[in-house]
Amino acid sequence: MACKSSCSLLLLAAVLLSVLAAASASGSCVPGVAFRTNLLPHCRDYVLQQTCGTFTPGSKLPEWMTSASIYSPGKPYLAKLYCCQELAEISQQCRCEALRYFIALPVPSQPVDPRSGNVGESGLIDLPGCPREMQWDFVRLLVAPGQCNLATIHNVRYCPAVEQPLWI
């Protein structure tokens, strides 16, 4: 009788352990758990700078963007530096998933605080002459050797199928 209950208990423990292991493996890069949900504001700035060009006050950008730190003359390289720092803070196995999440986010609704870099939402902005699709192509390259040179899952330096989020 004791053997039967011990075997049942061991079997139950094994099943629970396998369920927990499967859940943690599949959800290891969940937004809000593995990385912040208001992530990569500097990468958004850098992507806009590289794909849409440098904008000046009076352009068709939202008013809050014309005063963003990346548009000040003399320091355009800082956007790349800060973007790469933000990406480096995300674990290697979650970088591509963070970029997928970044692409899928809605348009930002409030300005970036230049002191803290905080923004209510991140994501790419659909602009006249610079659609989000064009920006996606550049986002895919952020981890590549010519940009931030950061390893991703499987120790490669690219993110395949970035526009297809795995967390949906």
Swiss-Prot record:
Q: Which family does it belong to?
A: Belongs to the protease inhibitor I6 (cereal trypsin/alpha-amylase inhibitor) family.
Gene Ontology CC entries for this record: extracellular region
Quaternary structure and interacting proteins, as annotated: Subunit of the tetrameric inhibitor.
Key words of the record: Alpha-amylase inhibitor, Disulfide bond, Protease inhibitor, Secreted, Serine protease inhibitor, Signal
| Tissue distribution | Developing endosperm.
Which GO-annotated molecular functions does the record name? alpha-amylase inhibitor activity; serine-type endopeptidase inhibitor activity
Q: Which organism is it from?
A: Triticum aestivum (Wheat)
Q: Where is the signal peptide?
A: 1-25
**Described function:** Alpha-amylase/trypsin inhibitor. It could be involved in insect defense mechanisms.
Any extra detail in the entry?
Answer: CM proteins would be involved in the cooking quality of pasta.
Where on the tree of life does the source sit, at the highest rank? Answer: Eukaryota
Q: Which SMART domains match?
A: AAI (SM00499)
Instruction: Reproduce the UniProt comment on modification after translation.
Output: Five disulfide bonds, which are essential for the inhibitor activity, are probably present.
Q: Which InterPro entries did the record assign?
A: Allergen/soft/tryp_amyl_inhib, Allergen/tryp_amyl_inhib_CS, Bifun_inhib/LTP/seed_sf, Bifunc_inhib/LTP/seed_store
Query: What is the predominant subcellular site recorded for this chain?
Result: secreted
**Where located?**
Secreted
Q: What is this protein called?
A: Alpha-amylase/trypsin inhibitor CM3
